[in-house]
Amino acid sequence: MATRLEEVTRGRGGGTEEASEGGRGGRRRSPPQKFEIGTMEEARICGLGVKADMVCNSQANDILQHQDPSCGGTTKKHSLEGDEGSDFITKNRNLVSSVFCTQEKREEIPGREARTGPPDGQQDSECSRNKEKTLGKEVLLLMQALNTLSTPEEKLAALCKKYADLLEESRNVQKQMKILQKKQAQIVKEKVHLQSEHSKAILARSKLESLCRELQRHNKTLKEENMQQAREEEERRKEATAHFQITLNEIQAQLEQHDIHNAKLRQENIELGEKLKKLIEQYALREEHIDKVFKHKELQQQLVDAKLQQTTQLIKEADEKHQREREFLLKEATESRHKYEQMKQQEVQLKQQLSLYMDKFEEFQTTMAKSNELFTTFRQEMEKMTKKIKKLEKETIIWRTKWENNNKALLQMAEEKTVRDKEYKAFQIKLERLEKLCRALQTERNELNEKVEVLKEQVSIKAADGDLVSPATQPCAVLDSFKETSRRTLGMHLEARAKSVCEKSAAQKPSSSGSPAQGIESVD
C-alpha cells in the first residue's frame, strides 16, 4: 500500500511538473525575467489546484464505490469530512490564485512591458488542458492504488493519509503566502522610501541646475562685458591709428613743404620717432595685456567649472555623511535615553542615600555638639576619657562578638521556632481530633445512660409483678457491669491520650504547652 501511495504522489508530482512546464512554455517567449518568475508561480498554483481537484474527485469516487448498507454511518461521516476538505482546499486555491493575480498585476503595471507570449485566453485554455490531463492521470493512479487494496477501511485510511498530506501542503502554502505578503509589504515600504529619496535627489538636482544656470548667465554677462571692452579698445586703436596716419601725412606734407627746415626738424623727427616707438610698444603691451586678460577669464571659467564639479561631489559626500551622522546620532540618542533612564534611577537611589546620610549627619552633628559641650566642660578629664574609650572599644569588640553570637543563636532559635510552630500546628490538629473523639464518646455515653435508664424503668415495671423478682435483678446487675466497663475503657483511653499530649507539650515552649492542657480540661 505504501508503494502504491508513493507512486500516486510521484504521479501527482509529475502532473504538477507537466503543468509547470506547460506554463513555462506559454511564457518562455517573453525575454524578461519577471515573466519567467510569474510562470513558475503560476505553475505552482496550477499544481495546487490540480492537487485539490484530484483529492476531491478521488474522495468522491471512493465514497460512491464503498457506500455499503452495513457501514452507512461511517461513509456519511467520511463524505462530510471530504466535502469540508474539498471546500477548504478550493478556498485556499482561490486565495492563492487571487494573490498571484494581484502580484502579477503589480509587477506588470509599473513597467508597461510588451508581452510577447500568448494572450490570456490561450493561457487559460492551456492551463485547463493541463489540469484535465493531470487530473485524469492522478485519478487513474488513485483508482489503481485503491483497487489494489482489499478492504474499504484500508482505502479510507489511504485517503485519510492523502488528505492529511494535502492539508499539510496547504498549510505550508499558507505559511509561504504569509511570508510573501510580509516580503511584499517590506518591498512596498522600501519602494516608498526610495521614491522619497528619489524625489529629494530630483529637488537637489533642480537646485543645482538652477545654480548652474545662474552661473552660466553670470559668465555670459562677463563675456559680453569683455567683448564690449575689447570692441571699445579696438575702436580706440583704430582711431589712434587713423589719427597717427593723419599726423604722418601732415608731417610728410610739411617735410615736402619745408625741405629747407630739414636740418632743424631732424631732431623733432627723431623725437617723434621715439614717441612713435613708445606708442607702438605701449600698444603691443596693451594687446599682450588684453590677451592675458582673455586667458585669465578662460582660466577663471575653467576653475568655476571645476569648482562646480567639486561642489556636486562635496554635496553628494555631505549627503552621505549626513545620513551616516543621522544614523549614528539616532543610535547615540537611543543609547543616551537608556543611559538617561539608568542615571535617573541612580539619581533616585543616590537621593535616598543622601537623605539617609543627611539624617545620619544631623545625628552626628547633634552628637558632635554635645561632645563639644562636653569637651569644653571636661577638658581636664580628656586623658581619663581616652583611657575609658580604649576600654570601651575593647568592650565593644567583645560585645560585637557576643552580638554576632547572639544573632547566630537568634537565627537558630527562629529556625527552631518555625519547627516548633509546625509541631504545634500538628498537635492542635491532633487535639481537635481528640476533642471530636471525646465528644463522640460523650454522646455515646449519654445514649448508653439513656438506654440504661430506660432498661431500669422497664425492670422496675416488671419487678412490680411478683413473679419476675429474681430474673429482674440479673439484668440490672448486667447493666451495672456493662456501665462500669464502658466507663473504665473511656477513662483509660482518655488518660493515655492525655499523657501522650502532655509529654509532647512539655518539650515545647510554655506558651505552647498551656493551650493543650486547657483543651483537655475543657474536654473533661
From Swiss-Prot:
What subcellular locations does the record give? Nucleus membrane; Cytoplasm, Cytosol
Disordered as annotated region, ranges: 1-37, 64-86, 106-130, 501-524
According to the UniProt entry, which residues carry Phosphotyrosine? 283
Judging by the UniProt lineage, the source's domain of life is: Eukaryota
Entry keyword annotation includes Metal-binding: no
Instruction: Name what induces it.
Output: By LPS.
Location of Omega-N-methylarginine modifications: 12, 24
* Molecular-function annotations in GO: DNA-binding transcription factor binding; syntaxin binding
Q: Where is the composition biased (Basic and acidic residues)?
A: 1-10, 106-115
Q: Which UniProt keywords apply?
A: Cell cycle, Coiled coil, Cytoplasm, Membrane, Methylation, Nucleus, Phosphoprotein, Transcription, Transcription regulation
Q: Which Pfam families does the record match to this protein?
A: Taxilin
Q: Tell me which GO cellular component terms the UniProt record holds.
A: cytosol; nuclear membrane
Where does the protein principally reside?
nucleus
Q: Which InterPro entries does the UniProt entry name for this protein?
A: Taxilin_fam
Could you list the residue ranges forming a coiled coil in this record?
153-465
Enumerate the Gene Ontology biological process terms: regulation of bone mineralization; regulation of cell cycle; regulation of cell cycle process
**Residues the record lists as Phosphoserine modifications:** 79, 86, 97, 512
Assembly and oligomerization: Binds to the C-terminal coiled coil region of syntaxin family members STX1A, STX3A and STX4A. Forms a heterodimer with ATF4 in osteoblasts.
Record family assignment: Belongs to the taxilin family.
Summarizing the function annotation, the protein's role is: May be involved in intracellular vesicle traffic. Inhibits ATF4-mediated transcription, possibly by dimerizing with ATF4 to form inactive dimers that cannot bind DNA. May be involved in regulating bone mass density through an ATF4-dependent pathway. May be involved in cell cycle progression.
- Protein's name in the database: Gamma-taxilin
Query: Could you tell me the gene encoding this protein?
Result: Txlng
